[in-house]
Structures are given as structure tokens and as C-alpha cells.
Amino acid sequence: MTQKNGPLRVGIGGPVGSGKTTLTEKLCKAMRDKYSVAIITNDIYTQEDALILARRQALSEDRIIGVETGGCPHTAIREDASINLQAVVEMTRRFPDLDVVFIESGGDNLAATFSPDLADLTLYVISVCQGEEIPRKGGPGITRSDFLVINKSDLAPYVHVDLEVMEADAMRMRAKRPFGFTDLHRGKGVQEIIDFIVENGGLEPRSN
């Protein structure tokens, strides 16, 4: 069903290579049969992530808009989100029944956050390959995101990372905010994230 105040806007942030685009792909493929879904991607100089998602057939091409931000990627999702807000308006014009828009940030550091004017819910993706210490380094992405995704958990033995240490640090840094370990390549942990989005975003499956 269409949201009364427009589509639910879900921001997906995280460093380069953490798995943001793969998460966006998995969420769209899992949710597109129950909800009207669209994607807005952010890249500094290209529309590479939008093209990747189109090639992977996450959604039809008309449901994907690639935004070229220029400069620092966090500016387009926080200080001046107008380019992304315009893309949301355009996507809503194309699909008046839109339920949810995933807004994928360009790769950025742990200080990146979404403006509350742009995102209703935020997911922040980190990878175990970036180091066991990442959760305890903090930063708004780690501490304030609505759901922290700790991706590539399957690679922990190969990069000498103790997942129990990461779990304890994430729990301490995030207080009671939820987080989860994922292996997005194999789809592990995706359903937990979907359940979080549906419950906290007030989504209801559209009737046939």
C-alpha cells in the first residue's frame, strides 16, 4: 500500500566495498513482489552503482535513478540533500503507488549520516574485512544508524577477525539499537533486515 506521507525512504550508507550495492540488490529482489520499490544511487562522477543494479536486474531500469553528486558524497545525503530529494520526487511522479525508496550513498567514512529530511530509516553497512576494531571506532554510522549491518561474516576466519569481539563492541557502542551479521553474497541475514524495515517503516504488503 502507498504510504500516506509518500514512500518510505531508507538510506543505505557505509564505506567503499562494504556491500551497500549488494544489500540494495538483495532487499529489492526480496521485496519487489510485495511492495512497489525504487532505488536512488549516489556516485561522485558516474552512475556505476545504478548500472550494476540494472544489470543484476534488481528492479526494472525505470525504477533506478543514478545521481552524480560531485565532491564529497556525504554532502548529497546530509548538508545539501536537494539532488536526492529531487530524485525522490521524480520517482514518485513515475510511480504514484510507490511504497519504499532505497537511497544508496556513495562510499564514505564512519562519520557519514543521512539528513532526517531525506531518510526515514538508515542502514549502515560495514565489513569484517575492514578490521575487527571497526565497531568500537564509533562514528555516527556505527552509533546512530537505525540498523547496523556487519557484512562478509563468512570471511572472518580468513582475515583473522573474532566475530564475538565485534558483536560485543557493536552491542556496547550501539546500546540497544539493533545490528546483525550478514553474508550478503549468499543472502544470509537479509530477512532480518527486511523484517526490521517492514516493522519500523510501517509497510503493509499490497493486496493483489
From Swiss-Prot:
InterPro entries: CobW/HypB/UreG_nucleotide-bd, P-loop_NTPase, UreG. Pfam families: cobW. GO terms for biological process: urea catabolic process. GO terms for cellular component: cytoplasm. Coiled coil: none annotated. It is found in: Cytoplasm. GTP binds at G14, P15, V16, G17, S18, G19, K20, T21. The keyword DNA-binding does not apply. Keywords: Chaperone, Cytoplasm, GTP-binding, Nickel insertion, Nucleotide-binding. The keyword Cytoplasm applies. Homodimer. UreD, UreF and UreG form a complex that acts as a GTP-hydrolysis-dependent molecular chaperone, activating the urease apoprotein by helping to assemble the nickel containing metallocenter of UreC. The UreE protein probably delivers the nickel. NCBIfam families: ureG (TIGR00101). Belongs to the SIMIBI class G3E GTPase family. UreG subfamily. Facilitates the functional incorporation of the urease nickel metallocenter. This process requires GTP hydrolysis, probably effectuated by UreG. This is Urease accessory protein UreG 1. The lineage of its organism: Bacteria, Pseudomonadati, Pseudomonadota, Alphaproteobacteria, Hyphomicrobiales.
